[in-house]
Amino acid sequence: MSTLVVLGTQWGDEGKGKVIHYLAKQADYIVRYQGGNNAGHTLIHENKPFILHLIPSGILFPDKYCLITNGVVVDPKALKEEIAILDKNNISVEKRFFISEQAHIILPYHKLIDGILEEENVKIGTTRRGIGPAYADKVKRIGIRVVDYLEKDVFEDLLEKNLIEKTPILKNSGVDIANLKEEILKDREELSIFLEPFVTDTSIMIANAIKKNKKILFESAQGTMLDLDFGTYPFVTSSNPIAGGVCSGAGVGPTKIDSVLGVVKAYTTRVGEGPFTVELFDEMGKFLREKGAEYGATTGRPRRCGWFDAVVVRHSVRLSGIKHLILTKLDCVEDIDKIKICVAYKYKDKLYKEFPASRTVQKYAEPVYEEMPGFKGKVKGIIDFEKLPLNAQKYVKRLEQLVDAPIDLISLGRKREETIEVRKGVNWF
C-alpha cells in the first residue's frame, strides 16, 4: 500500500489537520486535491499552534514534499502570506512545495462577486474568499490557470475577457473596473515571480512517486456533507471532497488509490447555513460548542453543534469506500449523563435510514435518537483503549456498528501524542 486518502465525514472541522499531521510522518508526499483557502487546519507542532489554509499540513516536517494540485483554486496573495508565516517560524518550503500549473487562480473580482452574490441570493454561508466564483469560471471555461497567470500576454488577454463578462455585476455594485484592472495587473507583476519556482505538472510528479512506491497522503478540505454532488445541496462547497475527487482533482487513476480513511467527530458540527437535523439549540449545544472550542479556524464563526449523526457518517463511509475511521474529540463528550446518537430521520411518518436527497426532508425531518449512558472523568492522557471508561468504550463500539466501519484511532487533543491506537499496528500505507 502506498496511497492513502484522508477526508472528513461530516461538514468539515472534524480534526483532519491533526490527523494528517499525525500520519504525515509516515508519508513521503502530502497532496491537497480540492478546495481553496476557505478551509483551515489547526494543529500543534513542537508545542506551537499553526493554522494552515492552503498548504498541506505535512509542510511542518522538513523531509516531506507537499503538493497543491489542479483541483485546488489558489489565491496567490493568501498563499504568499501563509508562506511568510512559515518562514517566520523557520519552516522553509523551498524545493519541497509545488503547485499544479493547471490549478485555477482566485483574483480580486472573484472575492467581490462572492460577497455580492451572498448578499443578493439565498445565503449559502460562504467565507467570501472567492472560491465559488473561481470554480464557476472554471466550469464556464473562462478561468485563469496558474500557467496562464505566469504568461503575461496570455493573462492580460484573459483578464480583459473576464472583466468584460463581469462588468455588469461589478458596476452595479459600484466597483471601479479601471481601478480593479490596474490593481490586478500590478499585483501580478510581483505575485507571478513569487509563484513561478513552485509551479510544475503535479500529476506527473505523483505518477512518478507512485512508480517508486513512495507513500502518498491525499488531504481533503471541508467534508463529505459539503460535497458539491453528495452534500446538502445547495449549501455545499464548489468541489468534491469525497475520495472520488482525488482522481479528477489530482490527476490520479482510481486503481492507484489503495485506501481511504475518514475523520469523524464524536458529535456533529456545521458552520454557516443549511439543513442540520441534529442541531441542538439548548444548553447541551452550548456545552459542546464551548467544550470543543467550536469556532471556525478560517472565519472565527461559532459552529452549530449537535449529537452524533450516524445517518450522515454512514453516507460518507459508503460514498468514499472508507476502510478506517479516526474518531476525534471523544474527550468533549465526557461528563454527560446520557449521550444520544441519531440513527435515522423521520418525516411525515416515513423513516429514513439513508441520507435523503430531498431538500424538504433534509430541512424538516426530525432525528430519531438512540440513547446511551454517558461516561465520567477525564479521558485525556489515556493511551490504551481498554483504559477508557467502560461506557466510553461502548460508545465507540456502537458508533462502529452504526456506520459500518472500524474506528482505528481516537484523538483526545490537538497534540500528536494525544492519540489512542484502538487497533495496534495498523499499516496506513
Swiss-Prot record:
Substrate binds at A297, T298, T299, G300, R301, P302, R303. Mg(2+) binds at D13, G40. Gene3D superfamilies: Adenylosuccinate Synthetase, subunit A, domain 1, Adenylosuccinate Synthetase, subunit A, domain 2, Adenylosuccinate Synthetase, subunit A, domain 3. It is an enzyme of class 6 (ligase). GTP binds at residues 12-18, 40-42, 303, 329-331, 411-413. Disulfide bonds: none annotated. Its main location: cytoplasm. The active site is at D13 (proton acceptor), H41 (proton donor). PROSITE patterns: ADENYLOSUCCIN_SYN_1 (PS01266), ADENYLOSUCCIN_SYN_2 (PS00513). Homodimer. This is Adenylosuccinate synthetase. It comes from Endomicrobium trichonymphae. The gene is purA.
